[in-house]
C-alpha cells in the first residue's frame, strides 16, 4: 500500500502543472490609474480613477469611477491593446459634463506609468460626437 501511495505522490509531483501564460500587452495596462479629462486647454479637468486587471482569458477588464461624484462604476471595454496604444470604449453612462447618456471612445499612448490621449463622446443612442477632449493618467498601483 505504501508503494502505491508513494508512486501516486511522485507521479502527481512530476505531472506538468498549468503553464503560465506569457504576459501579453494587456498586462502593461493593469493596475489603478488616476487622471483627469479636459474639454479645453483652460479646463481644470474632471478627475477619475480606472481600475484594470487581466482576466484569465488574457483580456483587459476595467472600470471607471468619477472620484468626485456618487456614481456606480462604469464598464470599460478594451477595443485595441498593443504595447504602446490602448483604445477603450466606456459606457454607456450618464455624463455629468454633457448631461446625457453617452458612450466614450478613448485612444491613449502608454509611456512608462503614464497613459495620455484623446476622447470622443457620443450619445448612447448613436449619432455625432457631442464632446471631444484629452486625458492624462498616471498609474498609482500596479
Place the predicted regions along the sequence by residue:
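Central antiparallel beta-sheet cores of small beta-barrel/beta-sandwich binding domains
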Residues: 25-110, 118-119, 124-142
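Outer-membrane beta-barrel biogenesis signature
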Residues: 20-22
Amino acid at each position: 500500500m505504501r508503494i502505491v501511495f508513494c508512486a501516486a505522490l511522485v507521479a502527481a509531483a512530476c505531472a506538468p502543472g498549468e503553464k503560465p501564460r506569457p504576459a501579453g500587452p494587456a498586462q502593461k495596462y493593469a493596475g489603478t490609474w488616476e487622471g483627469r479629462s479636459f474639454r479645453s486647454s483652460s479646463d481644470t479637468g474632471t478627475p477619475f480613477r480606472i481600475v484594470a486587471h487581466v482576466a484569465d482569458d488574457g483580456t483587459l477588464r476595467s472600470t471607471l469611477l468619477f472620484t468626485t461624484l456618487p456614481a456606480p462604476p462604469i464598464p470599460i471595454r478594451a477595443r485595441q491593446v498593443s504595447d504602446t496604444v490602448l483604445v477603450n470604449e466606456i459606457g454607456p453612462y450618464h455624463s455629468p459634463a454633457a448631461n446625457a447618456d453617452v458612450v466614450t471612445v478613448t485612444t491613449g499612448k502608454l509611456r512608462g506609468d503614464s497613459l495620455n490621449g484623446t476622447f470622443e463622446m457620443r450619445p448612447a443612442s448613436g449619432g455625432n460626437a457631442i464632446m471631444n477632449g484629452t486625458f492624462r493618467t498616471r498609474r498609482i498601483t500596479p
